[in-house]
Curated annotation (Swiss-Prot):
Family per record: Belongs to the reaction center PufL/M/PsbA/D family.
Source superkingdom: Eukaryota
Miscellaneous field: 2 of the reaction center chlorophylls (ChlD1 and ChlD2) are entirely coordinated by water.
Binding site for Fe cation: H215, H272
Annotated transmembrane regions: 29-46, 118-133, 142-156, 197-218, 274-288
Lineage per the UniProt record: Eukaryota, Viridiplantae, Streptophyta, Embryophyta, Tracheophyta
GO cellular component terms, A-Z: chloroplast thylakoid membrane; photosystem II
Biological role: Photosystem II (PSII) is a light-driven water:plastoquinone oxidoreductase that uses light energy to abstract electrons from H(2)O, generating O(2) and a proton gradient subsequently used for ATP formation. It consists of a core antenna complex that captures photons, and an electron transfer chain that converts photonic excitation into a charge separation. The D1/D2 (PsbA/PsbD) reaction center heterodimer binds P680, the primary electron donor of PSII as well as several subsequent electron acceptors.
Membrane topology of the entry: Multi-pass membrane protein
PANTHER family linked: PHOTOSYSTEM II D2 PROTEIN, PHOTOSYSTEM II PROTEIN D1
Official protein name in the record: Photosystem II protein D1
Localisation per UniProt entry: Plastid, Chloroplast thylakoid membrane
Residues that, per the record, bind a quinone: H215, S264, F265
Length: 353
């Protein structure tokens, strides 16, 4: 007689949940980072939409002069924004239950802090989810490393800068014109255009755009044609095909003759590493620059640095920039103080004779 023994499936509900969360067969990979990413990003997005449409004015400067940012309070898509949390709150953690009422929470700009903190946690988890999926598929981790650049930039403007300045009211408003206002005020107070890390960031972004356009145009111009002249060359590609889709030798020869031989990559892997690394490193430096300027380690100041033999100042473009900075700073928070802080710090001369 033969006995057949079946092992009972002892997998628990928790075990099935873990397998589902970490399965790479799902249409969208969730992962353990996704368990935190999904609710935080949904919260940030939902509150942003509601606040952008209907949030009441916020006392951003803490001087009882609220500024409206929502559509229902007179703004449009261009000038609307989520107004940063009030200077009266500073860096305090300000959830809804810390306010005496929801009206007070809205008046002090509570939605901004809620959105920003959930957003930063969400995008950090998205980066972790990229690493997690790469790990489970046996891929290298560089996708998450590249994504760390925009995560670092967002963290710098939404968290590190307010910490350095002592208040979430100094964070970047969540809107189009609010972003421009933040940039102008940042230039006025920190002279960011004269900071070397910002210069590296500009080189990274613009250089990355240039290299991306050059690479795309070279590849598109050196496709191996698999179709007739009457068909699109794109129809000659089949997803997953083993053959090369373009002639890298032809592209290398073209670019080497256009510039010089060693300006062109002859290794596809090192080429694509360069295309990824250039803008990523540039944005890393920009985020680092924002984080240092948050604590007032500002850009270079060459104000009145060129003088003639008689000691008279010979104005340079640096002096023009400094004059523009003062003008922008005067316009910033004009109701909170009458003069730029660096001018107001100078003791006024006596007028009593």
């Amino acid at each position: 007689m033969t006995a057949i023994l079946e092992r009972r499936d002892s997998e628990t509900l928790w075990g099935r949940f873990c397998n589902w969360i970490t399965s790479t067969e799902n249409r969208l990979y969730i992962g353990w980072f996704g368990v935190l990413m999904i609710p935080t990003l949904l919260t940030a997005t939902s509150v942003f939409i509601i606040a952008f449409i209907a949030a009441p004015p916020v006392d951003i400067d803490g001087i009882r002069e609220p500024v409206s940012g929502s559509l229902l309070y007179g703004n449009n898509i261009i000038c609307g924004a989520i107004i940063p949390t009030s200077a009266a709150i500073g860096l305090h953690f300000y959830p809804i239950w810390e306010a005496a009422s929801v009206d007070e929470w809205l008046y002090n700009g509570g939605p901004y802090e809620l959105i920003v903190l959930h957003f930063l946690l969400g995008v950090a988890c998205y980066m972790g989810r990229e690493w997690e999926l790469s790990f489970r598929l046996g891929m290298r981790p560089w996708i998450a490393v590249a994504y760390s650049a925009p995560v670092a930039a967002a963290t710098a403007v939404f968290l590190i800068y307010p910490i350095g300045q002592g208040s979430f009211s100094d964070g970047m408003p969540l809107g189009i014109s609010g972003t421009f206002n933040f940039m102008i005020v940042f230039q006025a107070e920190h002279n960011i255009l004269m900071h070397p890390f910002h210069m590296l960031g500009v080189a990274g972004v613009f250089g990355g755009s240039l290299f991306s356009a050059m690479h795309g145009s070279l590849v598109t111009s050196s496709l191996i044609r698999e179709t007739t002249e009457n068909e699109s060359a794109n129809e000659g590609y089949r997803f997953g095909q083993e053959e090369e889709t373009y002639n890298i030798v032809a592209a290398h020869g073209y670019f080497g003759r256009l510039i010089f031989q060693y300006a062109s990559f002859n290794n596809s892997r090192s080429l694509h590493f360069f295309l990824a690394a250039w803008p990523v490193v540039g944005i890393w430096f920009t985020a680092l620059g924002i984080s240092t300027m948050a604590f007032n380690l500002n850009g270079f100041n060459f104000n009145q640095s060129v003088v003639d033999s008689q000691g008279r100042v010979i104005n340079t473009w640096a002096d023009i920039i400094n004059r523009a900075n003062l003008g922008m700073e005067v316009m910033h928070e004009r109701n909170a103080h009458n003069f730029p802080l660096d001018l107001a710090a100078v003791e006024a001369p006596s007028i009593n004779g």
